[in-house]
Amino acid sequence: MHTLLWHLYWPQHLGGAAQHIFADAEAGKACIHVPTVVVAEALMVAQKGCLPGVSLDRLLRHLRAMADSDNYPLSPLLPEAVIASHAYTIIPDIFDRLVVTEAIACNIPVLTRDPVIQQAGLAT
């Protein structure tokens, strides 16, 4: 979730590789799969008022634009992914665990700085 929010609102927090990947997606040269659970978590955080300077309406506009774009397909949260996530209990946060499970199932990298996911060797 952090990577997506940083891209939308605080790109200076992204590393160079992430900035390049997002730039490629914006230019139509790459595709970034956005797990539905990331959208749900971002909405939850915005509703709680935990994103300084970001209103829920503003976030919804960004998310709708991404959903309408071919460059940011939303991947559904399927029961199979939820069940398979039990194998990744090394990741304590359920949202992060579901993101990793989905990425592994789709054979796509996880774009994150999360140290737990990185230490588990499950991130790019």
Task: Label each region the model flagged.
Residues 3, 38-39, 81, 99, ...:
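Alpha-helix capping/helix-boundary segments
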Residues 121-124:
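Active-site regions of enzymes building and remodeling cell-envelope glycoconjugates
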Residues 53-60, 68-113:
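Active-site neighborhoods of divalent-metal-dependent phosphate/nucleic-acid chemistry enzymes
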Residues 34-35, 77:
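Short glycine/serine/threonine-enriched helix-capping/active-site loop
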Residues 2-34, 48-62, 106:
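Short, well-structured N-terminal submotif of metal-dependent ribonuclease cores
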Residues 6-7, 43-45, 82-86:
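A short acidic, helix-capping loop that chelates divalent metal ions and anchors anionic groups
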